[in-house]
Amino acid sequence: PIIEQGPLVEEGATEGENFWHYRTFRLNYYAVKALQARVYLYAEMFSEALAAAREVVAVQEQYFPFTTKSQVTDGQKPDRIFSSELVFALQYPNRDKIFTDYFTPALKDDQMWLTPSTYLEKIFGTLALNDWRYESNWKVASGHTNRCFYKYSDLETDAYYADLLPMIRMSEMYYIIAETAENETDALESINLVLDNRGVELLTSASQLESTLLNEYQKEFWGEGQLFFYYKRMNRSSILSAFAGGNVEMNDTKYVLPLPQSETDFR
């Protein structure tokens, strides 16, 4: 189940006081339906994926409202993960270690996962500064020519979203509807709702839908593990390299992740 009031999390409240309010981030009913939509899409059961995604977006405004630009770009506690839109998330108290171990500008270029400016130019284009995700998550730091990835940086605040890791986003449901909708009007309406809440120019033609969906997955899910599986589902033979620049040629072997050693040691 999910609370009736929506995502009302009180900053500074004790864990007990906030316990029920955090249910919008747990694997609640709508998170299960969202996961169902994702799996149906992967299985190419498009009508079932569409129905499940529509059930989730039907409560978007009530339970998972769009994060505003002022919240995303707040100077003290920027909500870089668009937390109010998360259908399912995990709490990770050491989340900032992702940033300090791999992305902090305190590291030297050869010690960090540094994304070439050419990669960002390809996915964000000439209107990058209008995109809230670019403005909040990609920043030039002293000592580096390329932008550093700030999505998981330490907020130094008690904001409830400071330790959240996104698992399922409401935006993914709108992307699924855009991909599986029965007519172009519904498809454009669905993806444009996300674009409008990211500061991105709206689509006017369905001819751009496929390329825009690819572009949105690249921008929306960076650092969250979803992009790889989008590439795999679409069986893309070539993908952009986020670290080396240029493209990476893909095949069936590269799309199969190796099993962890802990799972193979005793087989």
Predicted segments with their positions:
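Terminal alpha-helical segments
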Residues: 136, 183-185, 190, 203
